[in-house]
Amino acid sequence: MESLCGVLGFLLLAAGLPLQAAKRFRDVLGHEQYPDHMREHNQLRGWSSDENEWDEHLYPVWRRGDGRWKDSWEGGRVQAVLTSDSPALVGSNITFVVNLVFPRCQKEDANGNIVYEKNCRNDLGLTSDLHVYNWTAGADDGDWEDGTSRSQHLRFPDRRPFPRPHGWKKWSFVYVFHTLGQYFQKLGRCSARVSINTVNLTAGPQVMEVTVFRRYGRAYIPISKVKDVYVITDQIPVFVTMSQKNDRNLSDEIFLRDLPIVFDVLIHDPSHFLNDSAISYKWNFGDNTGLFVSNNHTLNHTYVLNGTFNLNLTVQTAVPGPCPPPSPSTPPPPSTPPSPPPSPLPTLSTPSPSLMPTGYKSMELSDISNENCRINRYGYFRATITIVEGILEVSIMQIADVPMPTPQPANSLMDFTVTCKGATPMEACTIISDPTCQIAQNRVCSPVAVDGLCLLSVRRAFNGSGTYCVNFTLGDDASLALTSTLISIPGKDPDSPLRAVNGVLISIGCLAVLVTMVTILLYKKHKAYKPIGNCPRNTVKGKGLSVLLSHAKAPFFRGDQEKDPLLQDKPRTL
């Protein structure tokens, strides 16, 4: 009976031991359970199994909701941001980057200490001390010497010592990465980067978890946790960008008929795994034009019919990969011994190489080609695109200056005659810019009503003289076509109209004076001279006429009377 009680007590004690046993990495970092066969298949080079023990004395474990998280950092909480260049093709490298975001006004200096930013210290009402954590000043040289009792804290959670590269004393953060039942430890500053090779990983989504610890005396306390999903794929990650001239919206997958579409294939390969591989592109545009095979990642194609088409692209390449296991040699089936030949054939007694078992040859070839095996990888892209009619071309046919009834030196009006091909536009926009067509000065848009010939006249005003870049854009629901031209506006003098009027008046006045003078000269030159005759009647008449003219001119030409003394005597009767 006593022996039975002793056995039961031993079993109860053994059952209680795991509750007090040391924690393992998987207990601290995550709760995903991975079978042993998955751990062996997904083995990461340089990583360790999360079945190892965790040094809880040097790295305390805080669960979610623990009140100690609030006091883990001075001035607030530290946020860890985890990113990756996922998805990754099997065999390539995938990189994870963790960046620490400190509370407001805090940053890491060149020595690895955490300091306050000068520009916002006064806003927080801080003291004159610039440091949040001054780790380098608080450590003695003896703390960094390996093998001493004072350097026992310079270890990772699995009790492995820190590496000692140049400048490692400035690294005050410990990053523990955990995925696929394995962990990786790294010492760093406010950012850490880890790359893993995916050659042995299973395709599918996986989770990466990172826990960050900071120095706290001779221990390390957690300050942040973060996790992110990454994807391992056995298909080449492919994306295709489609662009077309005059297409109004590149993201709606609606394109124009009779204009080439540029297809550009983008392969997501951040680790340059496919740089040395020949890649072929097989296109099927869905318009019964056949299959196009190209080695170039860009291709142009023009649809000549309206409608909806299914685009299919297959990308193929060969990448290095493990060789398949050798096929086991199959022993020949048992058969009855053949009847002896009538005469012995010595040549059959020695087996020729062609009669050797195939297993030997397969094993030999497998060993030789084990380093040169390649695996075909494929990538696929599919899209449904719609082809419609649109505005194909816009051109300026004529530019004319608009005559102004009243001179306006500040503005100049110009008429532009614009034509287009294709669909009928619904809107016309004009952008007036500087001569480089970079800085817009004026933009005017208005609806237009165009007939079937697509001919319209646009009048625009220009502020002052100079050279302008004029951009005309005609658009409808699916297309947007444009054309540009340079135009020079000559200068105008504000006083030029008044000066022109004055010039005309002066010219008219000068012409009138000239005509008058010429008329007088011609009159004097051609005036006929008639002497006084002996006829008494004529004499009396002439004398009376002279007397009458003399009396009439007397009030107007008094000064000239002395020049004609004969007229001063009164007429007398002889």
Swiss-Prot record:
Keyword Signal listed: yes
Compartments (UniProt record): Cell membrane; Melanosome membrane; Early endosome membrane
Classification via SMART domains: PKD
SUPFAM superfamilies: PKD domain
Modified residues (Phosphoserine): 546
GO molecular function terms attached to this record: heparin binding; integrin binding; receptor ligand activity; syndecan binding
Membrane-spanning parts: 503-523
Stretch forming the signal peptide: 1-22
Name of the protein in its database record: Transmembrane glycoprotein NMB
Source organism (scientific name): Mus musculus
Source organism phylogeny: Eukaryota, Metazoa, Chordata, Craniata, Vertebrata
